[in-house]
């Protein structure tokens, strides 16, 4: 697995995060250092490697200030498997709900997909060539071979030849005639020239097995996986366009071309050495002694999480994985509780603390304009597909930021997410009418913003429901 991103310096990591996330420099620095320490550890001898564990991070800050986005972007920068879980979804062992080990299994699933996607990209040309060969045969089929009547193990029991149904490869066919060869040659040429992309072709694809709905979450998942492995793969016939068929067939051939066992082992190692687990809402399982019954349950979840953070060997469908060198990032608003309300052992497993700042009007302005694909740029691009050009003035952007900030102060503070609802509401009419106004140019001014939003933003009751 190519993890060249891990060799980035902390400054380079922060620079890449700055392309997508505004502010929160302290948090960016801490995650950048944590990533660099992983690279430093990889250069040590084996004995030293085993002694050095990642320094887990606890992010403290209200919703919508960038906690999850920093962790997710960081993982993407270095090509590390990343999973986000919510602490409130877990329950103590023995109760209905997700057990804490499921977060590790989910991370391994992500790691397997990452590794296999990269390995499949290396054989994509060969897989596509095989897919094109198959498409030629499907578009100009030859006669199928008849079922063989030899080498059947039941023959001796019944005293005669029994058709060997189901044992021939479904792709086996009679040698093509000269006429078919000529047709296939012509079809191959047309395929290469892209002239048949919209033509329909029938292909056989593996049917997605149905889910078992009568069991609990974890039992359901484990039983489903076991049944999928035991039962033969059922194929169904579908009629699709040639371009879609090529993708389906190429993906299937790529699966056959890569070494699945080797990919699984590589994925397990990647999860162990590079995996990042983001545990959100960890403040919700902190105990503050207000409700003793709930406190017992919350402490149970914390104590179940603790061994995972300390280092446990977890059984997955791909093999065992050790969590000792995974990086865990806890996050929470800690409005009601405090980090000190976590059990002492769990506090000790998050030695790095970082407090994220609440967002100001200036931050909202920067969020709307600075990131690589900011919200303003997103809406401009979407409406441009309808040939509608939207121009936001600087004053209008400032007015949007002021309204978002004020609504956050007057109602629930949901941080930067408020900008999504504000922009969506403001552009609702324009988005609806855009298909019927090609080549239009719309200037978004402070007056336009106020016309669309002022009556709502100044009414606290309406703001709470609409914005």
UniProtKB/Swiss-Prot annotation:
Composition bias, Basic and acidic residues: 178-192
Stretches of the chain forming a coiled coil according to its record: none
Any one GO molecular-function label of the UniProt entry: proteasome-activating activity
GO CC entries: HslUV protease complex
Source superkingdom: Bacteria
Subcellular location per the Swiss-Prot or TrEMBL entry: Cytoplasm
InterPro entries: AAA+_ATPase, ATP-dep_Clp_protease_ClpX, ATPase_AAA_core, Clp_ATPase_C, HslU, P-loop_NTPase
UniProt GO BP: protein unfolding; proteolysis involved in protein catabolic process
SMART domains attached to this UniProt entry: AAA, ClpB_D2-small
Region (Disordered) residue spans: 149-192
Residues where ATP binds: 22, 64-69, 280, 345, 417
The keyword Glycosyltransferase belongs to this UniProt entry's keyword annotation: no
Keywords (A to Z) from UniProt: ATP-binding, Chaperone, Cytoplasm, Nucleotide-binding, Stress response
Keyword Cytoplasm: yes
Function: ATPase subunit of a proteasome-like degradation complex; this subunit has chaperone activity. The binding of ATP and its subsequent hydrolysis by HslU are essential for unfolding of protein substrates subsequently hydrolyzed by HslV. HslU recognizes the N-terminal part of its protein substrates and unfolds these before they are guided to HslV for hydrolysis.
Family, similarity comment: Belongs to the ClpX chaperone family. HslU subfamily.
Known partners and oligomeric status: A double ring-shaped homohexamer of HslV is capped on each side by a ring-shaped HslU homohexamer. The assembly of the HslU/HslV complex is dependent on binding of ATP.
Protein name: ATP-dependent protease ATPase subunit HslU
């Amino acid at each position: 697995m190519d993890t060249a991103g891990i060799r980035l310096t902390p400054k380079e990591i922060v620079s890449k995060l700055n392309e997508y996330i505004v502010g929160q420099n302290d948090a960016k620095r801490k995650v950048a250092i944590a990533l660099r320490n992983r690279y430093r550890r990889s250069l040590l001898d084996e004995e030293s490697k085993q002694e050095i564990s990642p320094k887990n991070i606890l992010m403290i800050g209200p919703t919508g200030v960038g906690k999850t986005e920093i962790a997710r972007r960081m993982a993407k920068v270095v090509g590390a498997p990343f999973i986000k879980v919510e602490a409130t979804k877990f329950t103590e062992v023995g109760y209905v709900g997700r057990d804490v080990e499921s977060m590790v299994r989910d991370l391994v699933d992500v790691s397997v997909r990452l590794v296999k996607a990269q390995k499949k990209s290396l054989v994509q040309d060969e897989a596509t060539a095989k897919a094109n060969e198959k498409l030629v045969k499907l578009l100009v089929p030859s006669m199928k071979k008849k079922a063989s009547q030899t080498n059947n193990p039941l023959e001796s029991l019944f005293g005669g030849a029994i058709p060997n149904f189901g044992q021939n490869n479904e792709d086996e066919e009679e040698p093509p005639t000269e006429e078919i060869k000529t047709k296939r040659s012509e079809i191959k040429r047309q395929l290469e020239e892209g002239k048949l992309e919209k033509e329909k072709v029938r292909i056989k694809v593996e049917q997605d097995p149905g889910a078992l709905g009568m069991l609990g979450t974890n039992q359901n998942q484990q039983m489903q996986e076991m049944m999928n492995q035991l039962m033969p793969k059922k194929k169904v016939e579908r009629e699709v366009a040639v371009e879609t068929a090529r993708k389906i067939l190429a993906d299937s051939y790529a699966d056959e071309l890569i070494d699945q066992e080797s990919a699984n082992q590589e994925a397990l190692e990647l999860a162990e050495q590079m995996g990042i687990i983001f545990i959100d809402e960890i403040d919700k399982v902190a105990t503050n002694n207000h409700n003793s019954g709930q406190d017992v349950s919350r402490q149970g979840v914390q104590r179940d999480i603790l061994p995972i953070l300390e280092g446990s060997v977890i059984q997955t469908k791909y093999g065992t994985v050790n969590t000792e060198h995974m990086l865990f990032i806890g996050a929470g608003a800690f409005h009601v509780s405090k980090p000190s309300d976590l059990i002492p052992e769990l506090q000790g497993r998050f030695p790095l603390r970082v407090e994220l700042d609440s967002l100001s009007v200036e931050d909202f302005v920067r969020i709307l304009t600075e990131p690589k694909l900011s919200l303003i740029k997103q809406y401009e691009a979407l409406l441009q597909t309808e040939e509608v050009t939207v121009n936001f003035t600087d004053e209008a952007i400032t007015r949007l930021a002021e309204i978002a900030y004020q609504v956050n102060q007057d109602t629930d503070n949901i941080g930067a997410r408020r900008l999504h609802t504000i922009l969506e509401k403001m552009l609702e009419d324009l988005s609806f009418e855009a298909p019927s106004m090609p080549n239009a140019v719309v200037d978004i001014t402070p007056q336009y913003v106020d016309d669309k939003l002022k009556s709502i933003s100044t009414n606290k009751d309406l703001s709470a429901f609409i914005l």
